[in-house]
A protein has these predicted regions:
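C-terminal, charged low-complexity interaction regions
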Residues: 158-217
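Helix-loop elements that line ligand-binding/catalytic pockets
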Residues: 127-182
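Histidine-centered nuclease catalytic patch
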Residues: 70-109, 118-125, 129-136
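Short cysteine-rich clusters marking metal-coordination/redox-active sites
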Residues: 65-68, 111-114
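Short, charged surface segments at domain edges that flank catalytic/cofactor-binding sites
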Residues: 2, 17-67, 91-101
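Hydrophobic N-terminal alpha-helices or hydrophobic patches in metabolic proteins across all domains
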Residues: 61, 71-80, 115-117, 187-190, ...
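Beta-strand-connecting loop/turn residues
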Residues: 63, 78, 83, 147-148
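Extended, low-complexity, charged intrinsically disordered regions
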Residues: 1-14
């Protein structure tokens, strides 16, 4: 069950946890700058799914949306995007501003649903720390209840900014429960030693993924 207050709602019990995200992102930015001496806006290099940098960036997040936890494979990689955690509109509309907005430490792996829902929501002040997905602070704001819905922790129940974030990203939606089930099935398949059972689960997984994605088109 996923009801413990220290449990990361984005993970099942067998999911790898996010670790050293800031260090890994810094290392990736260093590699980009080494490969491209005149690079200014890191977003331009990281967001291209055809480039190796996107793969490296997504692996920092264990190939999962940093906000809801959906896995690449449950939804197509083409439905994943690189989000500006602090939206671009907060920064000046010039090269300096775009460079600041596009620094790797302000970029987050996000599914299409979360990124488009978040939109131009301004995250500032204390909320840059409270909702930070990189250091797992966000996992203290939301939780899974007994029915695997994502809920706001009681301590933040009256917080309008948190509620707005929750509603915009549709974190309480039914399909977030299905994504969690699919994550559980995927992890179980990886652990199974019986190929026949694994094959049956893979077939079930595939059918659920198709149904899930058709429903949301």
């Amino acid at each position: 069950m996923c009801t413990k207050k220290n449990k990361d709602y984005r993970n099942t019990d067998t999911c790898p946890v996010l670790t050293d995200v800031a260090l890994k992102k810094s290392a990736l930015e260093g590699k980009i700058r080494k490969d491209h001496k005149r690079a200014k806006i890191m977003y331009n290099y990281v967001h291209d799914k055809r480039a190796a940098y996107f793969k490296a960036f997504s692996e920092i997040y264990n190939s999962k949306c940093a906000y809801c936890g959906v896995l690449i494979g449950i939804i197509d990689i083409r439905m994943f995007e690189v989000d500006h955690f602090v939206c671009e509109d907060v920064f000046s509309n010039d090269t300096t501003g775009r460079s600041e907005a596009g620094k790797v430490n302000n970029l987050v792996l996000s599914c299409y649903s979360c990124n488009r829902g978040k939109g131009k929501l301004v995250i500032d002040g204390q909320y840059k720390k409270t909702l930070n997905p990189d250091d797992n602070a966000i996992a203290k704001v939301f939780m899974r209840d007994d029915n695997y819905y994502i809920k706001i922790q009681s301590v933040y129940a009256g917080d309008h900014i948190i509620a707005d974030f929750y509603e915009r990203l549709l974190l309480g939606s039914e399909f977030r429960r299905l994504d969690y089930l699919l994550l559980e099935i995927n992890n179980l398949i990886q652990r199974l030693h019986d190929p026949i059972t694994a094959q049956k689960l893979e077939q079930c997984f595939g059918k659920l993924v198709v149904k899930r994605n058709k429903t949301l088109i």
